């Protein structure tokens, strides 16, 4: 059953040039710890927040879009493990920072991950691309997912014009 009230913490923080992936994991851990201590049950990180990792992967990677997309995509399992552990440790739901995820045919999607206190719940590929995403060659997702959680149904990356369809379903 869903709680009557749901405390949500939305991350708004400066994007930093990190020298290593561990520093970025530490930043996530501090933010999750502070939000959970303040009573947040659901934590949301920024869209494309995972691209902050590109700086920790080296200047040559950070300055090359193709290299950044691939490197951040390759690093996502490490981020997934860290966020899954943080969700378990703090008993919160986390909408992790989205980022590029490699798909068949060498294409990338903008994938958002949702983690429950039990671990990873699922992944939603963004379906409606912005002009810059089209310029980058980011492919749209093809399926809208609804995640059943202890705090209720959650839909990620939802364009406003689809909301009516979801509510009526």
Short names for language-model regions:
Residues 2-16:
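Short beta-strand segments enriched in small/hydrophobic residues
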Residues 12-14, 46, 125:
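Residue-level recognition of beta-strand->loop/alpha-helix junctions
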Residues 12-19, 64-72, 151-154:
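Short, basic, glycine/proline-bearing loop/turn elements
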Residues 14, 100, 160:
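Residue-level signal for short, function-critical loop segments
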Residues 15, 50, 164:
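Active-site micro-motifs of SAM-dependent methyltransferase domains
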Residues 21-117:
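Cys-nucleophile CN-hydrolase/nitrilase-fold catalytic domain and related Cys-dependent amidase chemistry
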Residues 85, 103-169:
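Active-site catalytic loop in hydrolytic enzyme cores
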């Amino acid at each position: 059953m869903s709680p009557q009230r749901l405390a949500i913490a939305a991350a708004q923080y400066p994007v930093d040039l990190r020298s290593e992936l561990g520093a970025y994991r530490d930043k996530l851990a501090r933010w999750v710890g502070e939000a959970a201590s303040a009573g947040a049950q659901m934590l949301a990180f920024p869209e494309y927040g995972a691209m902050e990792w590109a700086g920790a992967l080296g200047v040559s990677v950070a300055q090359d879009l193709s290299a950044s997309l691939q490197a951040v995509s390759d690093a996502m399992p490490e981020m997934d493990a860290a966020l899954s552990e943080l969700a378990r440790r703090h008993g919160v739901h986390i909408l992790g920072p989205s980022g590029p995820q490699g798909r068949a045919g060498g294409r990338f999607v903008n994938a958002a991950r949702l983690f429950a206190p039990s671990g990873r719940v699922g992944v939603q590929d963004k379906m409606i691309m912005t002009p810059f995403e089209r310029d980058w060659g980011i492919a749209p997702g093809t399926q809208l997912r609804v995640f059943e959680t202890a705090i209720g149904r959650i839909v990620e990356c939802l364009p406003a014009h689809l909301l009516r369809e979801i509510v009526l379903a």
